[in-house]
Structures are given as C-alpha cells and as structure tokens.
Amino acid sequence: MKNVKKKNLDNQVEKLIELPNSLEAEQSILGGLMLDNEQWDYISEKISENDFFSLSHQLIFREMKYLLNKGYPIDLITLSESLEQKGKLEYIGRFAYLAELSKNVPSTANITTYADIVRERSMVRKIIKIANKIIQAGYDPRGKTSQELLNLAESKILSISEQNFQKNSGPKNIEELLDITLANIEKLFNTPYKGITGINTGYQDLNNKTSGLQPSDLIIIAARPSMGKTTFAMNICENIAMTYKKPVLIFSLEMSGEQIMMRMLSSLSRVNQEKLRTGQLNDEDWARISSTINILLKKKNMYIDDSSTLTPSEMRSRSRKIYRENNGLSLIMVDYLQLIKVPSLIGNRTLEIAEISRMLKSLAKELKIPIIALSQLNRSLEQRRDKRPINSDLRESGSLEQDADLIMFIYRDELYHEHTDLKGIAEIIIGKQRNGPIGTIKLTFNGHWSRFDNYSESKYSDE
C-alpha cells in the first residue's frame, strides 16, 4: 500500500515539474523559416521535429519538411493550405497562430542560435526521460541483474551522446578544412623531421613505412595462433607508454592483467619469461625487474582492462572515461576483436563484427587517437603453399578491410619450417595502408623475452 501511495506521489510530482523547454525559441525558428526558407538547410542539420517540446510545433515543422521535399516554398499560405488539406490546421491554432509565428520573429539572423537552444533543451529532456526509465527498471528489474541494469543505463545514455556527436558533425567548408590542413603542414614544417608524423611505434622500419601511427586511424594486427600478435601489439604499447605523457589504454579480453604484466616485465627487463613464471631469478634479474618496476610506477601511464566479456558500448564508455580523466590518450589497444560481443546481434557473426569494427573506427575519429585491434585469421590459409597472410584471410574480413586504415600481418617462417634460414625473424606484412605504401618489414623476434626488436642479424638470442 505504501508503495502504491509513493508511486502516485511520484507521478503527481512529475506532472508538477515542467520539462525543460523554450517555446519562444521554437516559435522563432518556425516563424523565421516562413520568412527565410533558405535557413532550412542549416536548421535541419541541428534539430529534427522530435526536438520540439510543443506537439503543435512538431506538426508544423514536419509539414515544412514535407513541403520543401516536394519543392514547394513555405509561407503562411502554403503551410496553412497543406495543413488544412490534411485536417490538421485546427490542431495548431489555425491560420491565426501561423500568422502570429511569422509576425513575432525577433530576427532571422539568429535562427541557428535558437536551434541550439531548442536542441539543448531537447537533450536535457531525453536525459530526464532515460533517467526515469532507469529508475523504473530499478524498481521493477524483471529478472535483470544489477550489472544488466548498469549496461542498460549505459547504453541508453551513450545513445544520446552519439546523437549529439552526429549533430555536431557534418560538411565543412573547404576554407575551414584548408585552415586545418595548413596548420598541420606548418606544424610539421616547424618540427624536425625524423620520418614520423604520428605516434612513434618504437620500430624504425615500421615508422619509415607508416610515418608512425596516425590519429583517428583504426589499425588491425592479425596473425595465426602463436605468431606473436599480442606480443607485437603489447610491445608497441610499451614503446608508446615509455615515450609519451598521455596514457595507453589496453582492453585484454583474452589474458588477465597479471599475465599482461608478467609479459611486460619480461619484455622491458629482458628477463626470460620462464624465469619469471618459476621464480628462478638471480641478482641481475632482480636488478633489471626492480629498475623496470620503478620506471613503470614513475610513468603511471598505462591502463589495463581485463574484463573477459565486453560490449561495444561498454568499451566506448570506459575509453571516454579514461580519456576525460587524463585529458587525452596516446593509444587504445584491443586484444582481441572477435571476443567483443554485441548482445542484439548474437547469432549473426558477420553483422556483429561489422558493428564492432564500425564502433572502433568511430571511437578513433571521436577521440582523434589511433586504435589497434587484434584479429584472428581464417584457418584456410594453412592449406596454401605460401602461408603468408593476405587481406582476405581476415575472419569476417569485409567490414574489417573496409574500416581499417592500416592492416598488418605477422608471419614467422620458423613455425612452418624447422630448418629455415629465417629463424628468429618476423615479417610484418602491411596488407593495407590508406595513406601510404604496402610492403613487408623485418623484425627480430625474441620470444623468451616476449619481445619484437628492430631487425638486426646480431640481435636474435635463443638463450
């Protein structure tokens, strides 16, 4: 009984509190559009009919869109005639209200500012509406766990954020783009050229091919099992974390954080992994490990999320959170792409991978940082004589090939040919580079250190 009373009271309070709106701004937009039809293209980029608080204003805006799509002008006569033919004129206050709208416009020059006001109020109303749904789901979870409720809340809030991001994007004038491009060129001109315009990978030959990892790029690293794709990606992350101030964020869906740290200590300390795993360390090993730990604790610029199950929305929200808290990121790495799940698309792996790929590319563009995503390869390449991977070997390759700016494959001949002359050598095959050449570079693979190094015949060690 108490719950019923509380619910009724909540409903009464909700009715007393008017949702945020600006009827004056809505009226000024509609009146301004009747006076200046050319403003439609600017306004329709910012708001839609659902952004209006007044149902009458939604109806008028929808009718304006209909008339303009038909090639008709919108004014008092055409608008009232069209509404009357559909029997809707009386719902909006008839001709008199339309006349009042066009008469009371402060200025058509400020119409885009009015649209910003209407959109802002609309966004707040959407947040309130979603908050109420989350509260309702909390009172009546219908079997949902607390984690499922959190995922629901997160996805709904993120959907609003995405809508807002899309409204802020759109065509840019060539003058604006030229200004941005020229500023970038001047920045590069005034910076001593070292063959790198993006993020330094730590690998000289790879930098020469790619000019570094570029902002907003989606980078796919793919290989068959045991080739070292996690090691290679982690080495890039380590190199960047040691060089740049802004942190690196790692999503490790396959390995635990402790396993990642064990590999990192082996790699950076040059201490054999087997020694670390068994604890059979000598004084020199301990000295190296201690030195590495001190450096890592001093830098403190790497985050590892080892959640074994993540959705695109969870990954996106966690990335944004770390980005905001640190005023930026240098890089995001995902190990590996096929382990991410899209609940609404489970059962259709092709569509699921396409959605994951789209999200990662969108996030890279939004945060303006490179994102590395590891991917599996199809088993079918094992049937070929030459087992060096190509783009079509990517699992669910269509969307990955399309969205990726850079695709790199790892091939180590020693895994297929025991007596090869290429022992300890890894080929990094660039299968796609949107703004650069494709080709192959060599790196030295020191597996016992969990490390790829710049290629040199003298650098390989099997100790």
UniProtKB/Swiss-Prot annotation:
Protein's UniProt keywords contain Ribosomal protein: no
Residue ranges of domain SF4 helicase in the record:
192-459
Molecular-function annotations in GO: ATP binding; ATP hydrolysis activity; DNA binding; DNA helicase activity
- Entry's EC annotation: 5.6.2.3
What enzyme class is recorded for this protein?
A: isomerase
Record's Pfam families? DnaB (PF00772), DnaB_C (PF03796)
Native species:
Buchnera aphidicola subsp. Baizongia pistaciae (strain Bp)
**PROSITE patterns xref list:** SF4_HELICASE
Q: Can you tell which superkingdom this protein's organism belongs to?
A: Bacteria
Report the protein name in the record: Replicative DNA helicase DnaB
Quaternary state and interactors? Homohexamer.
Similarity comment text for this entry = Belongs to the helicase family. DnaB subfamily.
* GO cellular component assignments: cytosol; primosome complex
Show the catalytic activity. Answer: Couples ATP hydrolysis with the unwinding of duplex DNA at the replication fork by translocating in the 5'-3' direction. This creates two antiparallel DNA single strands (ssDNA). The leading ssDNA polymer is the template for DNA polymerase III holoenzyme which synthesizes a continuous strand; ATP + H2O = ADP + phosphate + H(+)
Per the entry, what this protein does is: The main replicative DNA helicase, it participates in initiation and elongation during chromosome replication. Travels ahead of the DNA replisome, separating dsDNA into templates for DNA synthesis. A processive ATP-dependent 5'-3' DNA helicase it has DNA-dependent ATPase activity.
